[in-house]
């Protein structure tokens, strides 16, 4: 009986460790930028974007666990600038930033957004 209990405990530990494993992000140098890709535990891409001088730069795209786009964001040397798109279940919000400040928020038709 003790050995059965020991095997069950060992099995439970192995299951917990396997679920707790994280997939390491990847970083790829592209000229003066570094492309970063982050992953969910299930292996699907969570986020892709660029760094310049250790600051968020250019386009960043966040995905849900099913691989659908959640957010498209634009940074300029770590500063939120330009149009961001936040994708909901039945709508898309367009948020315009200038120097980290929200300038405008509006709902847009999905057909007007090319990445969906």
Task: Label the predicted regions.
Residues 16-116:
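Glycine/tyrosine- and acidic-biased, solvent-exposed loop/turn segments at the edges of beta-strands
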């Amino acid at each position: 009986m003790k050995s059965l209990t020991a095997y069950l405990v060992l099995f439970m530990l192995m299951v917990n460790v396997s679920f707790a494993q994280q997939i390491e992000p990847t970083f790829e140098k592209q000229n003066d930028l570094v492309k970063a890709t982050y992953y969910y535990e299930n292996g699907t891409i969570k986020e892709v974007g660029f760094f310049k001088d250790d600051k968020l730069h250019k386009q960043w795209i966040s995905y849900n666990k099913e691989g659908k786009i959640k957010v498209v964001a634009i940074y300029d040397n770590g500063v939120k600038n330009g149009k961001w798109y936040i994708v909901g279940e039945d709508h898309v919000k367009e948020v315009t930033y200038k120097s980290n400040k929200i300038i405008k928020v509006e709902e847009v038709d999905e057909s007007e957004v090319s990445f969906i």
